[in-house]
Structure formats: C-alpha cells, structure tokens
Amino acid sequence: MDDSDPPTYSLQIEPQDGCHPGDSVERRVTRLPSVSDENENQLAGDGPAGLTTSEGAMGRATVSEQDSLNNNESFPSSCEAAPTENAENTPSEGPKDDPPSLGQDQKLPAKRSPRAKKSSPKSAPPGDAVPVMQTQNATSQAAGEEEAAGVNANDPPKAPALQPLFSLIRGEVAQMDSRALPLFLHQVAETYFQEEDYEKAMKFIQLERLYHEQLLANLSAIQEQWETKWKAVQPRTVTPLRNSEKGFNGEDFEQLAKICTTHQDPLLSKLKTAPVEPSPERKSLARAIMSEEAVGTEAAAKEPEIETCPSTDPSGDRHEEEPQESSPGCHQMEWQTASPELPGTAGKDHTEELPSSTNATLDLHTQSLETAGSRSGPAAASNACKDSSCVPAPPTEDHCGVARDPKVAPPSESVAEQKLSTGDDGALPGLISEGKYSQAHRKELCLPLQDAFEALPRDQPHSSEVAEPRQPDVTASDGKSAQSQAGLETGPESALCGDRKACDVSTLCLEVCMAPEERRDSEDRVSKETEDYLHSLLERCLKDAEDSLSYEDIQDDDSDLLQDLSPEEASYSLQEDLPPDESTLSLDDLAKKIEIAEAIPAEGLVSILKKRNDTVGSHPAQMQQKPAKRRVRFQEIDDNLEQDEVGGGSCILLILLCIATVFLSVGGTALYCTLGNIESPVCTDFADNVDFYYTKLLQGVAGLKHWVYLS
C-alpha cells in the first residue's frame, strides 16, 4: 500500500499503541467495504473485523470494541502508527532502535476523520506500555454525521428516521378515530421538507389539510343538527342557568374567541420549543432512565468482552495522556457499577419492560435513532429509583469516571443529545422539534398519564448534558490533540479516579437542579401553543357555520313578519328585531359580539340590512316581549289631470295654431304684394279678398257698436 491508494475504498483500522518502546504489538489489518451515510463502525467481536492487540511485556490481551472511522470522510489524521502487512509480533523498540520501521509508519497515515484525532493519544511515555483504545466520542460522531449530511444533501431521507413515524401512522389509521394523526402527518411532511424531498412533503401536508377539512365538515354538520334541535325545543319561558354554565362567563368566551382568531398554528411548529421541566422526582428518574439507556446501547453492539479501565497509577502522567473519553466497555462497567440496581443487559430488560408501556405514540417525539432500540418503559425506571432523592452513585476508584463532564457520556447517548442540540439539517432534529411541539397538544387530547410521564425525562438531557459539547473540539494549530487540552482544562481532577468522583457528584447536581424561571417560561410557551391550537379549530368552525346561521335567522324573521302583513304591505316592509337573550346565544352570536360591539343607526334612518344589537347586560325578561316591527310604506304620486281639462287645453292650443297660421299666410302675402309685382294674379286676388273681408269686418264692428250703445 502506498500513498496513491484511494482512501475511501481501503480503510485500515488499527489500535494506537505502536510507538511504545519495549512493547510487542500484533497488528491485524482489516479492509472494510465502503458503506453509505450510516456510520456502522461498531464491530462484532466474533467477525473477521475483530481487532486484537497484544502486549508482550504485560501479557494482557484486549479486544477493540469500536473504531473511530467515519466511512464518508477521507482526511488523513496525525496518528503516527500504521499497519505492517508482512510482519507480526515485531518488537517496536523506539526511534533509535528501529528507525526504518518508524519511518515507514510515518509515511502511511491511516485514513481517519479529522475530528477523531481528539480521541487518540499522541505518544505514551516509555515504560507505560498499555494499549490505548480508540473510541469515538459523541462530538466527533455527531460532527462526522453532520459533515456527511452536508456532503450528501441530495440523497433520499434515511429510512430509519421515518420508519417509526410510518409505524405510528399505521397504528393511528387502524384506530380510525385518532386525533393525533394530523400531528404525525405534519411531522413527516416537515422531515421530508428538511431533507429537500419537496414532492413527498407536499403530499403529506395535503393529507393533513384534507384531514382538517373533513374535521371542519363534520363539525359543521354536528352544529347544524344541534341548532335544528335547539330551535325545535326552544322554550318560551326563561330556563334557569345550569351548573355547567355558572363557571364559564362571558369574559371566558371572549378570551377563547380572541385566542381562536389570533393564533398562527401551524407556523409555530418551526420554533424550537423548550421541553417542559419535570419535577425533582422526575429529574432523578430521568437520570436512572439515561443510565439504563446507556447499558442497553452498549449491549446492542454485541461486544463479546468488556474491557476494564486501569486503576489508579502511581504516575499521574498516565491519566493526563489518557484520552478524556474512555472505551465503550469502560462506560458500560462504570454505569453498571454506579447504579447496581439497574439490569446488566438491556436486551432482557427491554423485553420485560416493554409491555408496561401502554401507548407508543410518544416514542417518536422523545427518542433518537441511537436510543430507539434500547428504550425501556417507565416501570423499569421507577423500580430503579423509588424516591425523589435517588441518583446514580458515583463510580468507585476501581473504574474511570463517567459523568465528569458532558463529553464523557456513553457514545450513543451523547450522539443523540449532540444531534438534538446542534439542530442540523438531518431528519432527526425535525422530529425532535416536532416532538416537543406535539407533546403539548397531546396533553390536551387526554393521553394516558403514564406515557406523558415517560415522555418528560426524555427531553431533559438537552439543556443539561449538552451545554458545552463542541468547545473542546477545536484542535490547536500546532497539531496538539484534544486530550492534552482536556488535561489542561480539567487540571488535577483528571489525575486520579478518586478526584473524578467529586466531579461526578457536581455534574449530577447541576443536571438535577434547574432554574424555576426556565420552568415557568417553558410552561408558558406550552400553554400558549395549546391555546393557539384550540383557537384555530374554533375559528374555522365559526367561519363555516356563520353564513348558514345568519341566513336561517333572516328567513325565519321574514316569514314571521309576512304572515302578519298583507301582500302589498309585505312587499315594502322591513323589520328590526330587538337583541335576543344572552342565555340562549350560540357561539356564532358570541363571536359576533366580539367583532361588532354595537351598531346603532342614525336617528330618522331605516337600515335595509338585518341588524343584531347584542348588548351584554340585557335582561332575560326581554325575550318575553313581542319584538317591535317597523313598517315602511311607499306610495305613488297621483299627478294625472282630469279628462275635461285635458280636452279644453287641446282645443285652445288648436285655435291658437290656426290663428297663427292665418296671420302668417296673410302677412306673408301682403308683404309679397307690397314689395313685389302688384299686378300679378296673386296680388289681384289677394286685394279682392282683403277688400271683401275688410268690408265685412267694418260692417260687423259697426253693428257691434250699435248694440253696445243701445244697451
């Protein structure tokens, strides 16, 4: 093998114990096939990939339980040991005794993740030839998966992330009446959206919309049936208020209506809602569940042997050079020793305690992919911790400390917490954020108390154990590994396991003690989301039923009015009802009271629209009064003239037209004869006629004067 070999197709795994003088190291080179995005680096001890290291001086043999390879990364690390394929049991005598071998080791760096350098020692002092295990801590694993997700952003969503959701959706479909189905559909849609699979995201969001539309249709049908029955049995006398109505006044209805008209669901699902802080009893129970999950995760890896950590050593340099993260086997023994009442293996405990969980719908929102197979019911945790002051005992001096800081948590547990806190673009953070959001709603859906109690401790480690997960990840520019920086940070506390005991106790106290302000803030957020959810449902119901109810009320009032009026009066009559009794108002009327407080028409004007003045302080006795009816009548103006007057006027007009015509004709002819030819036949005839008529006129005037004088 030389430097030109592709790093991703020939991955070499080795223990980092090759540069110690006086040690006899046996190396076995194993080629692992290149796999996909999933980091499957846990190796079974009985397979061909088992890595064995032997120490000739000490006579101990250890089995590597987990390597630190990320199969998607091909960056060379700064480790100084490399495998030799043609030599076994070759003594490593230091730089001076065997320089060619060391030089060859330096030429062939193993292909590792750059973040895996934090878990490997740079060198060990002479004389202390103890094989150091390479363990992948939570930070490096989470970072590797984040980089892999960034590189393979166009890949389809991971099946393990959506498989629990699909199983829950199938369970909800089997029930046929579950209210949690739209929540699961929304979570699947958001998961696909974060994975940039927009087609499937649109399909699931459309399914959620169809569910809510059918829900609104069903609610509208129920409301119509209730309104019909209410109108049929509406009493004519005022009924006394029932006991259920005494505790819910108008202000409560107004507050509910305000919430229902101002919510923004499901836009709030994008927010990262803080989990509800449990009580001290549940916090101690959360610690027991976390330790139990660590045991189950380590047992699921199928390691045949458990590696014990070395006890206290006279030389303090050894603990300073030792990586801050211990091997998985060390973690397993430590957690079992710290809590002896917990079962040793999680497989048996999981099969025994699984029937105690009555509802598995909350598992999706409260667990990650790494802890999905090792989850136990709340009964196991309650058996492990029976009082509120029960916390896991700190590790003894025979084992390394586990909880000295957030980075020392078991690998699978730390990976789950790291992915929850970083909020990368994978499918898992979307599920967890939606889990927090849907948990508040499912409380309103009256889920069993046991499942709600089980879901609370699952969200706790985000705020306590992952407070500083990425601060030690930055390596120095001169090539120093993270183990030396961890030694400088912890100081003398990392020298002996006895010193780690105090650190364990302090860490547990910090995780159990939470600020009351954070608890109140989280409770306020959860209550606000619950109110928004109820508000959205009520608002849609009101909008659907408002039009139908108003139309029916108008028809009923108009029909009552038309029965009392004649056909002519009914065509011009409108009505205005007095406000009805408040005790018989429906939700629509209450909502209208909030939107339109009061509508008073101007004096002297009559509105042609139906008005409803609902005053809050109206007395129930007003319903007994007959509603006043205001009638508006229109009459046509009688402006027709009598027949006699019309005939007389026509005659006068005709006479006037005749006189005007005579004058025009006579005057025109006279003007023509005066200015024109007098000897023309027309003028001659006109002169004869004028003489004749003028003579007759003079005779008539003379006779008239004679009769006037005589009278």
Curated annotation (Swiss-Prot):
It is a single-pass membrane protein. It is found in: Cell membrane; Golgi apparatus, trans-Golgi network membrane; Cytoplasmic vesicle, Secretory vesicle. Residues 672-711 are extracellular. The keyword Aminoacyl-tRNA synthetase does not apply. It comes from Mus musculus. Residues 396-407, 457-471 have a biased composition (Basic and acidic residues). Residues 109-120 have a biased composition (Basic residues). The chain crosses the membrane at residues 651-671. Required for targeting of connexins to the plasma membrane. PANTHER family: CONSORTIN. GO terms for molecular function: connexin binding; phosphatase binding. This is Consortin. GO terms for biological process: positive regulation of Golgi to plasma membrane protein transport. Residues 63-77, 478-487 have a biased composition (Polar residues). Residues 1-650 are cytoplasmic. Interacts with connexins GJA1/CX43, GJB1/CX32, GJB2/CX26, GJB3/CX31, GJB6/CX30 and GJC1/CX45. Also interacts with GGA1 and GGA2. Does not interact with PANX1. Residues 1-157, 294-332, 370-389, 394-432, 457-496 are annotated as: Disordered. Belongs to the CNST family. Keywords: Cell membrane, Cytoplasmic vesicle, Golgi apparatus, Membrane, Transmembrane, Transmembrane helix. It comes from the Eukaryota. GO terms for cellular component: plasma membrane; protein-containing complex; trans-Golgi network; transport vesicle. InterPro entries: Consortin, Consortin_C, Consortin_N.
